[in-house]
Amino acid sequence: MKRTGKAAFILSACMVALALGGCGGGGGGRPPVAIPPPPPPPPPPPPPPPPPPPPSGGLNDAEYQASNSATTASALSAYQAGATGKNVKVAVVDTGINASLPEFAGRIDPASQDVAANRGIVDHQGHGSMVSGVIAANRDGIYMQGVAYEATILSLNVGDPAGCKPGTSDCFFDSALPVAIDLARTNGAKIINMSFGDEEGMPAETFAAVKRAVEAGIIVIMSAGNSGTAQPNSFALKNVQDAGSTGLFIIAGSIDANRSISSFSDRAGTGIGANHYLTALGRGNATVNHTGAHVAVNGTSFSAPTIAGAAALLAGAFPNLTGAQIVQLLLTTADDAGAPGTDAIYGRGILNIAKAFQPQGATAMAGSKEPVSLSDNGTVSGPMGDAAPNTGGGAIILDGYSRAYVLDLARTLGRVPQERPLAQGVSGGNFRTAAATSGKLMVAVTIRQNRDGRPGVETEQLHLGHEDGRRARAIAGMALSRLTPKTALAFGFSQSAHMLRQQLAGRWDNAFLVARDPMSRAGFHPGADTSIGLRHHIGPIALTVTGERGKVHMSGLRHRLDRPAYNLDSLTFDGKMGPARFSLGASRLREGTTILGARFSSVLSNGGSRTLFADGTASLDLGAGLEAYAGYRRGWTSMPGTSSLVEKGRLRTEAFAFDLSRAGMFAAGDKLAFRVMQPLRVASGGFDLEMPVGYDYLTATPRFERRFFNLAPTGREIDYEVAYGLGLLGGHLDLNAFLRTDPGHIRAMKNDMGAAIRFTLER
């Protein structure tokens, strides 16, 4: 073949150990001419103290740490995900490769050949071996590894058999270039690396061959050049102008170890090339030359294979990706550098393999269109405590590129904030209740004073004027009317139906601050809007019917309208037989989008729930002011299957309390009480999942297995509280001490204990 000297590879002066000369593609517009090496760098500053030695085991070992092309691009997480570039063919159009080097053993494609002569698979000049080393040097525990260390190299030697023209890197036959590019296309290359450029233009045949390659879906990585100019070399720009719309070109610029643009690197420019320009390490890249020597080399010649290796990792890990998608991923996940957005220096930014491997765009469960979050798919409620849903090895999700990932759904579930029952119990100090009666009607309003101590009324609830609203806030109210001697009706706003039921029955228990009545809670903080109660006596037994409508209080949702709704309807029988009192009740709780206050995304279950509670209480007057009490609640919750993933589920819950109290313990009018209580807890249950656990890229179908999503905790909160009350000095003195084990039904939580002293003046 005729040597015309139009192509110039990136480095001819970097074939000795720790070489300092620059290497890269060129600029200009003449037949294949060598690109001059960059000027030598200024003397380096004094070196910093050596870093600590890298870990000795695993993928993050000394060999990886020495592979600065990979480390600078943050490749470790891709390796940890199993990506190696295996079975991905990268064509290196260069000066050949030394096939005897162990760095490439078993991974040189049989179609590799000398396109410029008949020398066999050899590399007399070293540039091709060094470029190939950056891409795919073996991970063998010696020196360094390539970015895609299991990729296959299709080596296409276009080097001049006579060597480079003296004093230049003019080493290629122009007529060999289109032949080599066509061979890459016809032999199944996924990526073509071209670490060369030109000064005065390439023949039309070369550009036509490149266009045929990208039209076949092959990624083409080209060096920007080493002239330090404001634009990439003309070979790269002409290719982008001819076929850039295919989205398969990347122009590789160089950064140094400090992630700054290399002084010798041609920049992105302000033209069409900037959108295709990506930087990667191009100074001091560790690799091997054609003799097997360990060398450090400079030039955009080595930025290009770093990016080619990244593309090979993506292609091997995600076989569904097209070449254009791989290029788009590399460009859109680059770290922004220089001016915000695409700029004239760094173009799209700095290569970041870790980001390219992260899910991009909207994520959905494989086999469905159900959206799934990577971080927040719900919040378990208090009764679920430390429940650990069994999702096995995780669920398969697809990102916006239909790439399959394993997501541990359990790790995307949060917990409701831990309750602070003592703080909540004593916060009632700034409340007072005002009541008025007229005949058979009684009206009561609970007032919370403002910070200045003056009473204040919430205008949106009571529809008062602005001045009245400034002074007081009514937080709850009730109107009770006795319809007949045996029948009473009550209405409430911002007051629970449980409280209405107690008031209708004439019983009130507020001795305990922490171990509160477990029958009053359904597993979440209710925000009652309205409530109604009707009580009717039938001989010695009374029937109470109540209804409540409200919103589930959820952390982070400040506006009440955003909170999920619930309805709670109850039927209770209570009576007295001698010294004993009893009650039996049933309640139906309907939640619009929550499950006992737990919030789940649509991929799990956001269709709400239905819960039936059965309650029983009994108290016995033991005489001498001594009274015993026991209460038990059992709940059954059903959850509809609202997605293709979730089938119907059920929960079984329970709560209980045992009290012992004595009036007149130490003085007339005092009372000492002790309670043991378990808040509502999921005893068993969850829902069944038809979970995607595998994915076949060939058929684009997931493999499903049945998994159980457990919502029962391992922890069990038990509250112990002692309370003492005494009328004193025109007021009331209350002393409380408590212990909570496994707070929030979380076994790992430390026990919570405390005490409170309160003195309340009678108003």
Language-model segments: which ranges?
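Protease zymogen maturation seam
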Residues: 24-87, 102-103
